[in-house]
Amino acid sequence: MKYVVIFKAKIKTLDEQYFQTAQLLREKALSQFNCQKFEAISEQDFEIALSYWNSLADIQAWHHDAEHQVAQQLGKEQWYQSFSVEICKIERHYAHSVHSI
């Protein structure tokens, strides 16, 4: 993974359409657009999502996908008060895991 896209949003209202769309698009990004991993968390009225990618070309292709564009518009009109997107290059990665025997 070379890049991470950081999506941060202040939530207005999330309805059933949001949850269905989010699940569909997550699966589509992972299966059709070379997204390597996706993580998201919400707390009160704040949401943050991290998606990991190998290339800027894959990120751009995903951004321009027709279904993703519709969801972006719905986000602006219905689901979010505000949001921001940051695309960052991953220079290093560290991890630790404790395994039970």
Question: Over which residues does each language-model region extend?
Answer:
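Short S/T/G/P-rich N-terminal loop/turn motif that feeds into the first structured element of a domain
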Residues: 1-47, 56-64, 81-101
